[in-house]
């Protein structure tokens, strides 16, 4: 009988203040996060960004207790999922693979091989696919498979996205409903979805399906919420966590909060739609930064829907995804790691320079300008990057 391993993919996060710099370096070394036309620029640029952003990021992590809870919560999710699977007759062992911090993907692969796993289900803890999240993790796993004959012999099936899974949609609707009913005027509360943003070029030029999946997911949740409540709440969607001067998906969360406040919204239910675990974006960015913006603009009652964490229906949904994958609904790792044809990442074909609409050309030129700005600011201790919020 095959030994089943369920590999949960997630971002990772620094558990201690001293981990912040190395974590940022790992993050920005990934070409799916910052796409450059020349590979040699990647690690020097990552080093500079991590050096210059460490202080600000450390301050943010101090405000939530000194480190990210993401590993602890993800491991709780893994234990709950393993227990649920075994209770329904699936003898599986769960493993956690973080992309940019411990436990790294290599460690999870080594553990699966040591345990004698022969069949692997790869489940990203990102409901919505993006080339910069699930795509990067799948691609890293594919790299390990290509370089490890023993790992390559395993049967590997993947779940690419699951934003429309009924249990996920229902879990979100249930948690939102609780916050709406806790408002003084439930029918007048505004439901505000905020998702992690990505550069606009990823969607418009690289063909990333992320924005479409976020929008469709929001509508599915709203439909279920209306059926459950029996009344309709106004709602909106925005994107957070923008970094650097490049245009990201709009509207931006902080700008929508200002508009909602000025339009007279007093009760706001904030939904972190792309996050299934509490971490820096929910605990610091939403709970502290965005709450302050909302209150400054007249929003009196700011309620934030908790992340799913180990919500029972959510765990049940993850188990159903695993079960379906084992029954043939998953896709191969090769298919899961395949990027849209318009995306160029390392290893790349010979680069063609020229004045055209390729996002990589422009990203490369911008990267060189930013690189020079970094060097200048290292010397003078200030400059334009402070003004645009990168430092």
Curated annotation (Swiss-Prot):
EC number(s) given by UniProt: 4.98.1.1
Binding site for Fe cation: 196, 281
Matches recorded under PROSITE patterns: FERROCHELATASE (PS00534)
Entry GO MF terms: ferrochelatase activity; metal ion binding
Reactions mediated catalytically: heme b + 2 H(+) = protoporphyrin IX + Fe(2+)
Localization: Cytoplasm
Biological or metabolic pathway of the protein: Porphyrin-containing compound metabolism; protoheme biosynthesis; protoheme from protoporphyrin-IX: step 1/1
Pfam families reported for this sequence: Ferrochelatase (PF00762)
Gene3D superfamilies: 3.40.50.1400
Gene Ontology terms: cellular component: cytoplasm
Role summary: Catalyzes the ferrous insertion into protoporphyrin IX.
Family: Belongs to the ferrochelatase family.
PANTHER family the record matches: FERROCHELATASE, FERROCHELATASE, MITOCHONDRIAL
Protein's UniProt name: Ferrochelatase
This protein's encoding gene: hemH
């Amino acid at each position: 009988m095959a030994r089943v391993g369920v590999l949960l993919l997630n971002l990772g996060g620094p558990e201690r203040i001293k981990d912040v710099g190395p974590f940022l370096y790992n993050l920005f070394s990934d070409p799916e996060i910052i796409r450059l036309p020349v590979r040699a620029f990647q690690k020097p640029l990552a080093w500079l960004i991590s050096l210059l952003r460490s202080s600000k990021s450390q301050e943010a992590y101090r405000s939530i207790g000194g480190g990210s809870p993401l590993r602890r919560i993800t491991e709780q999710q893994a234990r709950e999922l393993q227990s649920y699977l075994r209770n329904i007759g699936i003898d599986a062992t769960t493993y956690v693979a973080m992309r940019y911090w411990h436990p790294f993907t290599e460690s999870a692969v080594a553990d699966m091989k040591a345990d004698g796993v022969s069949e692997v289900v790869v489940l990203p803890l990102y409901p919505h696919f993006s080339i910069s999240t699930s795509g990067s993790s799948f691609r890293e796993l594919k790299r390990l498979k290509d370089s490890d004959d023993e790992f390559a012999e395993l049967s590997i099936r993947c779940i690419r996205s699951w934003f429309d899974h009924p249990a996920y949609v229902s879990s979100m609707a249930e948690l939102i409903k609780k916050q709406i009913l806790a408002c003084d005027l439930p029918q007048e509360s505004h439901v505000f979805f905020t998702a992690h943003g990505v550069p606009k070029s990823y969607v418009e030029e690289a063909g990333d399906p992320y924005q479409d999946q976020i929008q469709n997911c929001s509508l599915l949740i709203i439909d279920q919420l209306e059926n459950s409540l029996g009344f309709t709440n106004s709602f909106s969607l925005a994107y957070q966590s923008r970094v650097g001067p490049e245009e990201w998906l709009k509207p931006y969360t902080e700008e929508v909060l200002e508009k909602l406040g000025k339009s007279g919204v007093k009760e706001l239910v904030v939904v972190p739609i792309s996050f299934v675990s509490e971490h820096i974006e929910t605990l610091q960015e939403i709970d502290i930064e965005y709450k302050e913006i909302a209150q400054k603009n007249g929003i009196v009652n700011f309620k934030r829907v908790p992340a799913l964490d180990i919500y029972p229906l959510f765990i049940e949904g993850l188990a159903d995804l695993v079960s379906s994958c084992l029954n043939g609904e998953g896709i191969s790792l090769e298919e899961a790691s395949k990027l849209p044809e318009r995306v160029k990442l390392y290893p790349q074909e010979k680069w063609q320079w020229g004045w055209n609409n390729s996002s990589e050309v422009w990203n490369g030129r911008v990267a060189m300008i930013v690189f020079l700005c970094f060097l200048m600011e290292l010397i003078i201790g200030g400059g334009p990057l402070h003004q645009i919020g990168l430092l």
